[in-house]
């Protein structure tokens, strides 16, 4: 950003008083790195720490940030403020050092709220679909020439980044309910895609507490703001009378203000009509598969329509939508002859979904777009607590594929819970008699164990929120072919 652009931006958004150097603990996370990227482009000195380099830290380094791949007290020296992710414990040496030096320590959402405070904020919340919906809203606003700032929890593929600093008053951001920190945000518009029981440790196992927290989030809207909510979701329908703000509903339901009708999927694209009250119908081609993505698009269209964005810009943005990283992310189609000697090919798709509802939506999108494919899933459960709390739901959903390989639970810092492990889940699924899951205890054996189940007309879904995305990229790099050293090590 040049000096003239920066001066123009600061005429819209005042800089934080006496803050020059901002340090992020856990800077390699998508949400943390996105905020750091926006602040770096605003001219702040950025530093941060994490355990290992990744594309987020590489991008920040290219912008001039100083990244430490360790956690040491001296890393926070001279920082004006320290921003901490929810994954960082209070006894982290950098947090302890900041407190001792009387440096303010704030959560990620507090810094996001500061970015939003002087802008027209659009916050996207909900259990599922936040990242994709944030990308859709951002794409529509960009297509309309509104040059928004956006901060997303996943890679916006069209932009090649998780976050971007725009020069207008608009800020579009994913709002995270996992630690209730979205209560710091005070947007002008809020989308709520759905509400399900997830991250229940934050809410002390009380679903009513979770629901009330969403209501409290919506009450952060000014009285002239707007809540955009999916009326198909039974919890949202129940909560609507308690919102107390102007609302626009969307969904397949007949009473939705923005209604999805005549949905059909052809390959990776969805085709449908959006009916809007008092507005012309929109005949949409969406470059993203699945009915769940039609709902995400309806939310984005509801916000854009309220803003007065032209229909042709909306339609162009949705038809050219490139998606987000690890959301039904097509990694290639590979011939099987070098893999297992069979004719034909296998498609490889990587997806972040890790809740039964998300996995179910991904499976349905795959079945709808490629009904004749042999559907093979490599699944990595995420967190022992989630596996325990949603055990039966996972067992039911995962029986819908034709072949299932399962990695060990990705713990995300949790201790193992008896009966909530991958071996137990495989046993439960096997006992139901529909499929015979394969437990892959060593990730290095994935290609070797995958090859025999491929038929020559396959769609492979690599599914989960842990490090399974790295395995998906590795499978793409080796074109699914088991490696010689792999066979020597395990054969």
UniProtKB/Swiss-Prot annotation:
One of its GO terms (cellular component) is cytoplasm. Pathway: Cell wall biogenesis; peptidoglycan biosynthesis. The keyword GTP-binding does not apply. The keyword Magnesium does not apply. Its main location: cytoplasm. Keywords: ATP-binding, Cell cycle, Cell division, Cell shape, Cell wall biogenesis/degradation, Cytoplasm, Ligase, Nucleotide-binding, Peptidoglycan synthesis. Its EC number is 6.3.2.8. It comes from the Bacteria. It is found in: Cytoplasm. ATP binds at residues 126-132. It catalyses: UDP-N-acetyl-alpha-D-muramate + L-alanine + ATP = UDP-N-acetyl-alpha-D-muramoyl-L-alanine + ADP + phosphate + H(+). GO terms for biological process: cell division; cell wall organization; peptidoglycan biosynthetic process; regulation of cell shape. Cell wall formation. Belongs to the MurCDEF family. NCBIfam families: murC. This is UDP-N-acetylmuramate--L-alanine ligase. It comes from Salmonella typhimurium (strain LT2 / SGSC1412 / ATCC 700720). The lineage of its organism: Bacteria, Pseudomonadati, Pseudomonadota, Gammaproteobacteria, Enterobacterales.
């Amino acid at each position: 950003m040049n000096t003239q652009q920066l001066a123009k931006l600061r005429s819209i958004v005042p800089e934080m008083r006496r803050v020059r150097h901002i340090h992020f603990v856990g800077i390699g996370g998508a949400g943390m790195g996105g905020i750091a990227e926006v602040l770096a482009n605003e001219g702040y000195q950025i530093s941060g720490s994490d355990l290992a380099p990744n594309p987020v830290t590489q991008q920040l380094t290219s912008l001039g940030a100083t990244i430490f791949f360790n956690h040491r007290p001296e890393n926070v020296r001279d920082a004006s403020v320290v921003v901490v992710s929810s994954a960082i414990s209070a006894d982290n040496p950098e947090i302890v050092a900041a407190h001792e030096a009387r440096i303010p320590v704030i959560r990620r959402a507090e810094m996001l709220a500061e970015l939003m405070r002087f802008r027209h904020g659009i916050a996207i919340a909900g259990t599922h679909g936040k990242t994709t919906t944030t990308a859709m809203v951002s794409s529509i606003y960009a297509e309309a020439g509104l040059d928004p700032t956006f901060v997303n929890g996943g890679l916006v593929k069209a932009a090649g980044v998780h976050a971007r600093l725009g020069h207008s008053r608009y800020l579009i951001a994913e709002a995270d309910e996992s630690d209730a920190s979205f209560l710091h945000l005070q947007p002008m518009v809020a989308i709520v895609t759905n509400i399900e029981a997830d991250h229940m440790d934050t809410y002390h196992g009380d679903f009513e507490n979770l629901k009330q927290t969403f209501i409290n989030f919506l009450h952060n809207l000014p009285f002239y703001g707007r809540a955009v909510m999916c009326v198909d979701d039974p919890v949202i329908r129940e909560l609507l009378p308690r919102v107390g703000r102007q609302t626009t509903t969307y969904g397949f339901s007949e009473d939705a203000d923005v209604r999805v009708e005549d949905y059909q999927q052809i390959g990776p694209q969805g085709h449908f009509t959006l009916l809007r009250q008092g507005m012309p119908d929109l005949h949409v081609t969406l470059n993203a598969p699945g009915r769940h993505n039609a709902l995400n698009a309806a939310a984005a269209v509801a916000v854009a329509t309220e803003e007065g964005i032209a229909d042709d810009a909306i339609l162009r943005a949705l038809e050219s939508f490139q998606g987000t990283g690890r959301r039904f992310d097509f990694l290639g189609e590979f011939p099987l002859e070098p893999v297992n000697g069979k004719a034909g090919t296998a498609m490889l798709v990587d997806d972040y979904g890790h809740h039964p509802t998300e996995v179910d939506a991904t499976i349905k999108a795959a079945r709808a777009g490629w009904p004749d494919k042999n559907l093979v899933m490599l699944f990595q459960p995420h967190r022992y607590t989630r596996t325990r709390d949603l055990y039966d739901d996972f067992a039911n959903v995962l029986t819908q594929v034709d072949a299932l390989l399962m990695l060990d639970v990705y713990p995300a810092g949790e201790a193992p819970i008896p009966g909530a492990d991958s071996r137990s889940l495989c046993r439960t699924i096997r006992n139901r008699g529909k499929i015979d899951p394969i437990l892959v205890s060593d990730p290095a054996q994935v290609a070797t164990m995958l090859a025999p189940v491929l038929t020559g007309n396959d769609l492979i879904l690599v599914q989960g929120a842990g490090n399974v995305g790295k395995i998906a990229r590795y499978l793409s790099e080796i074109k699914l072919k088991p490696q010689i050293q792999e066979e020597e090590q395990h054969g």
